[in-house]
Amino acid sequence: MEAVVLCGVQGSGKTTLYRDRFLETHVRVSMDLLRTRAREAALVRACLDTGQRFVVDNTNPTPAERRRYLEPARAARFRVIGYLVEIEAAEALARNAERPDRRRVPPAGLVGTARRLIRPTLEEGFDELWHATAARDGGWRVEPLLTTPPLPGL
């Protein structure tokens, strides 16, 4: 039983990481899809109750926001893995600008998320933490979070 919590600004590649690494094995929990916290909580609860692996694909910039997934997952004896999906600020803004209108975030919103983003820590309750960046070859560079310095911010 495993819960994966993705963290990162809009346009950093969280959904792409989900598709590339977890699509065939984990349910995707995303406010982009579910639209309300009640629906999101119901889906998380269903995953926990049935032992279904899941990935939370939201920005999750702060420990308080991550806690809503970590605490119930830990209580259900799930292994909790975090991924900080980072990207250069200019690249995040460029990717966001290329999104369809319904998925585009105002640049001020993206900058606001970047300013609120606090790197996750094991003390929050994660069993593992990984740092993911998109590689130039289209794949992913994934390494332990504790060994990677922060990328330049917004």
Regions found by a protein language model. Name each.
Residues T15:
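Walker A/P-loop
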